[in-house]
Design a protein with these regions (language model features):
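Active-site region of glycoside hydrolase catalytic domains
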Residues: 1-57, 100-102, 111-474
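Glycine-rich, proline-tolerant flexible connector loops at the mouths of alpha/beta enzymes
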Residues: 92-106
Length: 474
C-alpha cells in the first residue's frame, strides 16, 4: 500500500516567463524577465546592478520565444494528461492581463488565453495550481514607480489578484501569490524588479519592497477567500535548509541565521506577524520598515498552505570561503563534500528534502506542497533516437522516497509538481541546455530549433509512478 494519501496531487510545473514566449502577442506588455539577456550581462541585470529599461538589438532574450507554450499549450497539456497528471502548476503573466500593470480594466485577450489554458486542463481532469507573480513584474511599474519599493504596487497587485480570482473562479482553486518570494534578497531585479542607485542601502530597499510584497500577498489571500471560500492560497519559498559546515558553534549559528534569512518571508505569511528576530536583523542592517496604518492587521490573513521548491540543501559557516562556494538556485552556499553534484554543481541530497519538510512543518503546522523539484541536466539523443535520462529518474526516485518518509513522519503533503516537466528556459542561466523535463523540446541556447516535443525515458517512468500513487518507483 502506498504511503501517499488518496487524492495526492501528482504533476509538474512550468512558468509563464520560461515557457510561453509570444512576449508581444495578445496585448501583452513587457516584463522584467523580457529585459534579461542571455550571456555575460545576465547576472548584473538580475542583481539590479545594471539598468536595462530598453531592449538591445545585439542581445538574445530567451524569454521572448521560450518554448512557445502560448501556441502549443494544447499539445503540452495533452502530454501531461498522457502521464496522468492530477495537477499542473503554471503562472499567469501579470502583463498579459494588465500590460502596464497600473490599468483599471484588464486586457480581455489575456483573460481569454488563460481561461482556455485552464479549461484545457479541466478537460483532462487536471487541477491548475496558479502562481500570480513568477519573476515577471510589468516593466512600466519598474520605470514609472520603482517597482516594489513603491507602496502603489500593493494597490496594483490587489486589483490584478482580484481580477484573476473572479475571472477564473470555478476553474482554479489552488493559488500561490509570489514565486520563491525570498529570492528577491538574492536576485533583486528578477525577484522584485528592483534596480539600485549608487550608494543607497540595498538592504533597506529590499526589505521595504519585501514588506510591500508581504502586505500584497496577505491582501490577495483575503480577497481570494472573499471571492470563493473554497479557494486555497499558498506562499512559496525557495527551500533547502542550511547545514552547519562543522559542529563549531559559530557555524551552527551561521546556519541558523541563513535559514532565518530565507524563512523570514514565510514566517510572516504563515504566522501573520513579523518574527521576533527580525527587529535585531533590521537594526543591524540599518533597516526601518515604513508601515502604513493597518498593515499589521492585514498581515494576519495567513496562507492556507506552505509551498516550496527543493533542489538541494545548503551549507553555512561563520567563515564563508568563496573558493568553496556553490549557488544552488541562486542562494549562495558552501559546497558539501558528502554530496554528489549535478552538471551545474548543485548538491544532490534527498535526505535534505525530508529534513527540510520536517523543519518547515514543525515551524508552521500547515499542509506542505512541494511545487518544484528536479534535476537540470544535459540530455543527448541515443543512436536509436531515444533519450535515456536514467540520471533524472534516479534523482526523482530518491526524492520521492524522501517525500514518502516525510509523510510517514506525520507531515501532511498535498502534492508534488516536478519542475520543468516539459523543457523550458532556465531562470538562473537563460539556457535551454539545462533541461528538467520529461519531454525534450528541440531548442538550443541560441534560440535555434524546431520546438518539436519528444518524450524521454523518464516520461514513461513518471507515468508509472503516478498510476501507482508513488508505489512503483522502479
Amino acid at each position: 500500500m502506498s504511503v501517499f494519501p488518496e487524492g495526492f496531487l501528482w504533476g509538474g510545473a512550468l512558468a509563464a516567463n520560461q515557457s510561453e514566449g509570444a512576449f508581444r502577442e495578445g496585448g501583452k506588455g513587457l516584463t522584467t524577465v523580457d529585459m534579461i539577456p542571455h550571456g555575460e550581462h545576465r547576472m548584473a541585470v538580475k542583481l539590479g546592478l545594471e539598468k536595462r529599461f530598453q531592449l538591445r538589438d545585439d542581445e538574445f532574450y530567451p524569454s521572448h520565444e521560450a518554448t512557445d507554450f502560448y501556441h502549443r499549450y494544447k499539445e503540452d497539456i495533452a502530454l501531461m494528461a498522457e502521464m496522468g497528471f492530477k495537477v499542473f502548476r503554471t503562472s499567469i503573466a501579470w502583463s498579459r492581463l494588465f500590460p502596464q500593470g497600473d490599468e483599471i480594466t484588464p486586457n480581455q485577450q489575456g483573460i481569454a488565453f488563460y481561461r482556455s489554458v485552464f479549461e484545457e486542463c479541466k478537460k483532462y481532469g487536471i487541477e491548475p495550481l496558479v502562481t500570480l507573480c513568477h519573476f515577471d513584474v510589468p516593466m512600466h511599474l519598474v520605470t514609472e514607480y520603482g517597482s516594489w519599493r513603491n507602496r502603489k504596487l500593493v494597490e496594483f497587485f490587489s486589483r490584478y489578484a482580484r481580477t484573476c480570482f473572479e475571472a477564473f473562479d470555478g476553474l482554479v482553486k489552488y493559488w500561490l501569490t509570489f514565486n520563491e518570494i525570498n529570492i528577491m534578497l538574492h536576485s533583486p531585479f528578477s525577484g522584485a524588479g528592483l534596480v539600485f542607485e549608487e550608494g543607497e542601502n540595498q538592504d533597506l530597499v529590499k526589505y521595504q519592497a519585501a514588506h510591500h510584497q508581504l502586505v500584497a500577498s496577505a491582501l490577495a489571500t483575503k480577497i481570494a477567500h472573499e471571492v470563493n471560500p473554497q479557494n486555497q492560497v499558498g506562499c512559496m519559498l525557495a527551500g533547502g535548509n542550511f547545514y552547519p559546515y562543522s559542529c563549531k558553534p559559530e557555524d551552527v549559528w551561521a546556519a541558523l541565521e541563513k535559514d532565518r534569512e530565507n524563512l523570514f518571508f514565510i514566517d510572516v505569511q504563515a504566522r501573520g506577524t513579523y518574527p521576533a528576530y527580525s527587529a535585531r536583523v533590521f537594526r543591524e542592517k540599518g533597516v526601518t520598515i515604513n508601515k502604513a496604518p493597518g498593515d499589521d492587521e492585514i498581515l494576519k490573513n495567513t496562507v492556507d498552505f506552505v509551498s516550496f521548491s527543493y533542489y538541494a540543501s545548503r551549507c553555512a559557516s561563520a567563515e564563508m570561503n568563496a573558493n568553496n562556494s556553490s549557488a544552488a538556485n541562486v542562494v549562495k552556499s558552501l559546497r558539501n563534500p558528502y554530496l554528489q553534484v549535478s552538471d551545474w554543481g548543485w548538491g544532490i541530497d534527498p535526505l535534505g528534502l525530508r529534513i527540510t519538510m520536517n523543519m518547515m512543518y514543525d515551524r508552521y503546522q500547515k499542509p506542505l506542497f512541494l511545487v518544484e523539484n528536479g534535476l537540470g541536466a544535459k540530455d543527448e539523443f541515443a543512436a536509436n533516437g531515444e533519450i535515456n535520462d536514467d540520471y533524472r529518474i534516479s534523482y526523482l526516485r530518491e526524492h520521492i522516497r524522501a517525500m514518502g518518509e516525510a509523510i510517514a513522519d506525520g507531515i501532511p503533503l498535498m502534492g508534488y509538481t516536478t519542475w520543468g516537466c516539459i523543457d523550458l528556459v532556465s531562470a538562473s542561466t537563460g539556457e535551454m541546455s539545462k533541461r528538467y523535463g520529461f519531454v525534450f523540446v528541440d531548442r538550443d541556447d541560441a534560440g535555434n530549433g524546431t520546438l518539436t516535443r519528444t518524450r524521454k525515458k523518464s516520461f514513461w517512468w513518471y507515468k508509472k509512478v503516478i498510476a501507482s500513487n508513488g508505489e512503483d518507483l522502479e
